């Protein structure tokens, strides 16, 4: 059974391994956490020493490890080369995915994202703008040749954060959005690898400098989870918003009629998307905020 705890380490310390436990040591105390309890390990400072045996065991247990830079921003995460015995078979399937199937799956995923943006604006009582995005949703075509996704995003972010807001601006709002999206991306990248796929080969994302094109495609409907937290805390500074973003690891969300932790939803959603792409009879899953 997968772990459930998100462990955040943000002070000078040493992390090591002993008898299936992560050992935390600093000048003041020593603590032990059984690996079976850990789902995510967030290393929020560069002032941490890890043993290679611990790293090896974290990979064995499929624990998501996120590394932060000297500004405490996520900069990398640990993923194994192969997370299942038949990864070569799955990679061969991935390379052979039919263009029309990729188009159908990608369009369904983006439709969910646009719909969730509309729903969230309605939740915030921006009913006119919500309806404008809903109209874009109803006019969405395969692979979105008219860029309705982009038009929706512009309406959405300008409604939430003001007409002068752009995603290129250097401010606390964008820093928080990027931080939250990176947390999401790391969760999806882990599940992509667990499914035996290469993270680099996406559906529509094809940036040669993006190592996580497929995870970037699949995570799209989940972005409004981050947007909601940032919007609710928009008057706070980045440090405060960042702390609130950690709630995505402990909150539950409605999925398939059940309240579930986000990591479990991400796992199920990703598996079903991959099965749909493999044409194994799985319907494209839905996620609604």
Swiss-Prot record:
Enzyme class, first EC level, given as a word: hydrolase
Transmembrane region(s): none
Gene Ontology BP term (one): defense response to virus
Cofactor dependence: Mg(2+); Mn(2+)
Enzyme Commission code: 3.1.-.-
One Gene Ontology MF term: metal ion binding
List of residues binding Mn(2+): 149, 205, 220
Keywords: Antiviral defense, DNA-binding, Endonuclease, Hydrolase, Magnesium, Manganese, Metal-binding, Nuclease
Cited Pfam families: Cas_Cas1 (PF01867)
Keyword Transmembrane helix in annotation: no
Recorded phenotype for the gene knockout or disruption: Plasmid transformation is still inhibited.
Keyword Manganese: yes
Superkingdom to which the source organism belongs: Bacteria
Function: CRISPR (clustered regularly interspaced short palindromic repeat), is an adaptive immune system that provides protection against mobile genetic elements (viruses, transposable elements and conjugative plasmids). CRISPR clusters contain spacers, sequences complementary to antecedent mobile elements, and target invading nucleic acids. CRISPR clusters are transcribed and processed into CRISPR RNA (crRNA). Acts as a dsDNA endonuclease. Involved in the integration of spacer DNA into the CRISPR cassette.
Family per record: Belongs to the CRISPR-associated endonuclease Cas1 family.
Quaternary structure, from the entry: Homodimer, forms a heterotetramer with a Cas2 homodimer.
Identification of the protein by name: CRISPR-associated endonuclease Cas1
